[in-house]
């Protein structure tokens, strides 16, 4: 590309090919030494982005990230209670299923022996030996464990204490955080005169005149701290019959506001904490003739 050049000495203009840019020679008009302006052409210069123009973009990016984190946190806070409630509902359903399995095992025992098992067995001197929970092991698919237990010795004898840590999982409520590996059960019967489980006396099916669907068979007793093999349950004579009541001798639960119970007909459901004590007492008795409200 030609370069227009004016001699600084004589003022004459001329067209010079750009390949001579930066070279010196004699002016065609006056003969004076001249230097053609220009030189190697470099890469075109691009305008540099100033730090002041980049700052708003950085601020916007930070705002977007922080805003996104805030939204995630808010969503998590909103969803967490719903997730926890769903999990608790699932555990409550599993607890009801446990009570149903225990109730069905008791029914199978009754089908074989024509009576429900006693609350506990005793030796010749009347000393308590084993719980009903041990007696129904064969009906809970745990006959191998049952066959190893020395039924003629106390539950905590030298030969038997080794089995205390082998509690079947059906005896633990799913909401009990200490359940895995636990030796204590969350399920009990109400033991005492008037109930299905009156000491060491088995209860014939015909003795339940209030109706199987109106008589409690097994209840949740998470506050009782009961070793599963120990021949001990809730004492009917000492109960206040309050669902969720304080102390270790009441129907109690890991589930807020309810407790799981199983009936003699094999059904199971939850009782609300506000159930009147008179209703609870009526459900415990097997031959009291009480009127049970329809909603219970």
Where are these regions (language model features)?
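Cys/His-rich metal-coordination motifs, chiefly Zn-binding "fingers/knuckles"
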Residues: 1-51
């Amino acid at each position: 590309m030609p370069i227009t050049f004016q001699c600084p000495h004589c003022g004459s203009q001329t067209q010079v090919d750009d390949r001579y840019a930066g070279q010196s020679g004699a002016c065609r008009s006056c003969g004076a030494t001249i230097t053609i302006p220009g030189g190697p052409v470099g890469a075109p210069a691009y305008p540099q982005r100033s730090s002041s123009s980049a700052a708003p973009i950085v601020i916007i990016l930070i705002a977007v990230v922080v805003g996104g984190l805030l939204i995630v946190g808010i969503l998590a806070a909103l969803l967490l209670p719903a997730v926890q409630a769903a999990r608790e509902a699932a555990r409550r359903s599993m607890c009801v299923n446990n009570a149903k399995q225990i109730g069905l095992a008791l029914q199978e025992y009754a089908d074989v022996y024509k009576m429900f098992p006693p609350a506990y067995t005793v030796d010749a001197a009347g000393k308590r030996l084993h719980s009903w929970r041990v007696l129904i092991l064969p009906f809970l698919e745990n006959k191998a464990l049952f066959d190893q237990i020395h039924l003629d010795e106390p539950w905590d004898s030298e030969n038997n204490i080794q089995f205390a840590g082998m509690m079947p999982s059906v005896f633990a409520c799913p909401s009990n955080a200490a359940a895995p590996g636990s030796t204590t059960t969350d399920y009990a019967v109400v033991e005492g005169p008037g109930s299905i489980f009156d000491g060491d006396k088995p209860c014939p099916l015909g003795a339940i005149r209030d109706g199987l669907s109106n008589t409690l068979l097994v209840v949740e007793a998470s506050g009782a701290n009961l070793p599963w093999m120990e021949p001990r349950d809730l004492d009917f004579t000492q109960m206040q019959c309050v669902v969720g009541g304080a102390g270790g001798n009441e129907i109690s639960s890991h589930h807020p506001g309810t407790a799981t119970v199983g009936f003699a007909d094999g059904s199971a459901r939850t009782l609300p904490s506000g159930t009147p004590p008179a209703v609870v007492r009526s459900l415990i008795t097997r031959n009291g003739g009480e009127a049970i409200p329809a909603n219970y």
